[in-house]
Amino acid sequence: MIFQEKQKFVQWWLWLIIFTLTVISFMPNENNSFNYVYILFGCLIPIFFYLMELRIKVDNIGIHYQFYPFHIKYNTFFYNEITKIEAVMYKPILEYGGWGIKQGFKGKAYNVNGKYGVKIYLNSGKNVLIGSQKHIDFAVFANNELKNHLIVNKK
């Protein structure tokens, strides 16, 4: 079995800002000419945000995550690196400085939307938060796999 989730930036206010900046980029400057660099970025930024996606997979090997296009391939937290997994509600702006790939006082976060996630505590003493709209299912599935891993390794 496997747990999977894909998330995109869907905040209406973010898309309003991006749309506004795109429209502004097509406005002529004071010389009544166009700045093609602004137009280029005005077109590329919405495409870039549309393509951004947080992908999560949980299986019997570990917890895999990819923040596309920043991560070309999945990164993995193997169960032998994990001490605890818990579903959490958090404050993205106050605790991590917003959404995206963030480093805050409470550890690293990968999130794109909302205020729910799964906190992964590592043997190293560090912790990582992965934002999730299915945080309960994610945590239950991952904890079951973590228990199975611990049982197998005790034998």
Segments from the language model and where they lie:
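Charged, low-complexity, helix/coiled-coil-prone segments
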Residues: 21-30, 57-59, 79-90
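Hydrophobic alpha-helical transmembrane segments
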Residues: 30-41
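Conserved beta-hairpin
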Residues: 42-84
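Non-transmembrane, membrane-adjacent beta-strand/coil modules in membrane-associated proteins
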Residues: 66-126
